A protein has these predicted regions:
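C-terminal substrate-binding subdomain of Rossmann-fold SDR/epimerase-dehydratase oxidoreductases
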Residues: 73-198
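Short acidic-hydrophobic sequence patches enriched in Asp/Glu that either
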Residues: 59-63, 125
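Aromatic/hydrophobic pocket-lining residues that form π-stacking "cages" and hydrophobic walls in ligand
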Residues: 30, 70, 130
Length: 198
């Protein structure tokens, strides 16, 4: 798992190049402001986020909103869903409402220049998540895995032990299925007026 002291080590995976460097530069900027101006900035490094108000643009959204939108539209139009890769890569997912709770927790419990990994460190395969979203959305068509498209890095585990040492507990995370269900209820309420569609 990626520990906080490894954030700047080596080149990021090509599939995550820009995003990884952006996280690194935010850490540099946070430390510089802390050092030069005495700002109590911290660098909280999340993993894969999802939830209401996410970006549902199929060209640049994260995996959960992309799958959720594809399955919703396929269900409505009675079509199959094509997903990239083979579905085997493992990812950690954190609900946006959990992220908000963690950030409030950090305001009271963390004031250090070193970055801190935040987010649920339980791993799920993309296939598991897709099947869960299919059940939640009521999608009954076929999920076609396009193995000619990239699957991405197989794993991107993060070490959340520093957050745990501060008192955050695994039980403080909302259940993935419940969080996906809440998110889909929001999608139904807002569709088609979702960010990335309109």
């Amino acid at each position: 798992p990626l520990t906080e002291d490894q954030i700047h080590a080596g080149r990021p995976h090509v599939s995550n190049f820009g995003y990884a460097y952006a996280k690194r530069m935010l850490d540099v900027q946070s430390r510089a402001y802390r050092q030069q101006y005495g700002c109590n900035f911290i660098t909280a490094v999340p993993n894969n986020l999802f939830g209401p108000n996410d970006n549902y643009d199929l060209n640049n959204s994260h995996v959960i909103p992309a799958i959720m939108r594809k399955m919703h539209e396929a269900k409505v139009n009675n079509k199959n869903v094509v997903l990239w890769g083979d579905g085997t890569p493992l990812r950690e997912f954190t609900y946006s409402k959990d992220l908000a709770d963690i950030l409030l927790f950090l305001l009271e419990h963390y004031d250090e220049p070193e970055p801190i990994n935040i987010g649920n460190t339980k791993e799920y395969s993309i296939k598991e998540v897709a099947e869960m979203i299919a059940e939640i959305t009521g999608f009954t068509g076929e999920i076609v895995w396009d193995i000619l498209k990239p699957s991405g890095q197989h794993r991107k585990p993060s070490d959340g032990s520093r957050l745990v040492e501060l008192g955050w507990k695994q039980k403080d995370y909302k259940d993935l299925r419940k969080s996906l269900t809440e998110t889909y209820k929001w999608v139904i309420l807002k569709y088609p007026n979702l960010r990335g569609i309109v």
